[in-house]
Amino acid sequence: MNKKMGKIVAGTALIISVAFSSSIAQAAEEAKEKYLIGFKEQEVMSQFVDQIDGDEYSISSQAEDVEIDLLHEFDFIPVLSVELDPEDVDALELDPAIAYIEEDAEVTTMQTVPWGINRVQAPIAQSRGFTGTGVRVAVLDTGISNHADLRIRGGASFVPGEPNISDGNGHGTQVAGTIAALNNSIGVLGVAPNVDLYGVKVLGASGSGSISGIAQGLQWAANNGMHIANMSLGSSAGSATMEQAVNQATASGVLVVAASGNSGAGNVGFPARYANAMAVGATDQNNNRATFSQYGAGLDIVAPGVGVQSTVPGNGYASFNGTSMATPHVAGVAALVKQKNPSWSNVQIRNHLKNTATNLGNTTQFGSGLVNAEAATR
């Protein structure tokens, strides 16, 4: 609908039309704001529009000029979108045919900050300018699917029959979102939204993979200058090959962050149990150890892992439980620390995360405590 402008004169049975000079009209136009006028009936609204078209309208009030620019007439609800001077609203509200007048307020897409992101105090670190810029993070998982809330820089696949990094399972995309979901007013927010994110597919669409594939993924991370490798995967059995790969990646400068496991047992799973992997357990909203989270002497640190909302394939979002969900919180905070201290080694970053963690008590249950982005970026 074309924009229509009508002159309204508020006054008892007084119907006139006044011409403004161009300078006055321009000033009046600049003073106008957008409003929505709701009418009690559709028919009455149509009569109102006809009067605007004819530059005629009257209401019982003190005589004063009211000018309305009609922007849109809804045909399924009795509402008009208009522009008018805010000072004229009171006069229009005296019309008994008008049910309400409200500002045509701005509405934006809503971004949710998941509880875990707040719990590790990532938004405070981000407000200081630490968002992971310049830090390369590899997610060794089921791949990462394209998503409006993720910026993927590249990656590689080491799963036979699945040559690209697209995620046929969903797990890797969820992990990636906790690390790196963009600060873009949609969906969710990650711990380190500006990291350089890489998908390294070592698990197939079924959610499983081989030791050789995971070792190749670690080799890729080392050879391609990754600063951090997130491994939200594990096994109850150790592997000499896997341990060598973790050790070599660490020697190459990669901080390997791994999930402690989900059996609830009092020992840490593999590869998190290896000395050169940072073992991450899970906590709930009450800072208790999640019942499924494996624990023990080898546990380094904990992070939120219950009801973690993040990205999933298909531009969607969902909530999950697991130490797999806790681990990317730690990987993300590690990226913030690396940005703040670019010369620090992976060993320095690991120690710093442990030294700045929030003490939750029993070290067997919680390691050094809850990862704390605010304290880690002071």
From Swiss-Prot:
Domain annotation Peptidase S8: ranges: 114-377
EC number: 3.4.21.-
GO biological process: proteolysis
Gene3D superfamilies associated with the record: Peptidase S8 propeptide/proteinase inhibitor I9 (3.30.70.80), Peptidase S8/S53 domain (3.40.50.200)
Entry binding sites for Ca(2+) 1: 111, 149, 182, 184, 186, 188
Keyword Endoplasmic reticulum carried by entry: no
Cofactor note: Binds 2 calcium ions per subunit.
Active site: 141 (charge relay system), 171 (charge relay system), 324 (charge relay system)
PROSITE patterns per UniProt: SUBTILASE, SUBTILASE_ASP, SUBTILASE_HIS, SUBTILASE_SER
InterPro entries according to UniProt: Peptidase_S8/S53_dom, Peptidase_S8/S53_dom_sf, Peptidase_S8_Asp-AS, Peptidase_S8_His-AS, Peptidase_S8_Ser-AS, Peptidase_S8_subtilisin-like, Peptidase_S8_subtilisin-rel, S8pro/Inhibitor_I9
Highest taxon listed in the record's lineage: Bacteria
A UniProt-annotated Pfam family: Inhibitor_I9
Chief localization: secreted
Cofactor dependency: Ca(2+)
Keywords from the UniProt entry: Calcium, Hydrolase, Metal-binding, Protease, Secreted, Serine protease, Signal, Zymogen
Compartments, as annotated in UniProt: Secreted
Binding site for Ca(2+) 2: 272, 274, 277
GO MF term (any one): metal ion binding
Signal peptide start-end: 1-27
Cellular component GO terms, alphabetical: extracellular region
Propiece residues: 28-110
Chain's role: Digests elastin efficiently, has a substrate preference for Ala in P1 position.
Family: Belongs to the peptidase S8 family.
UniProt name for this protein: Alkaline elastase YaB
Organism of origin: Bacillus sp. (strain YaB)
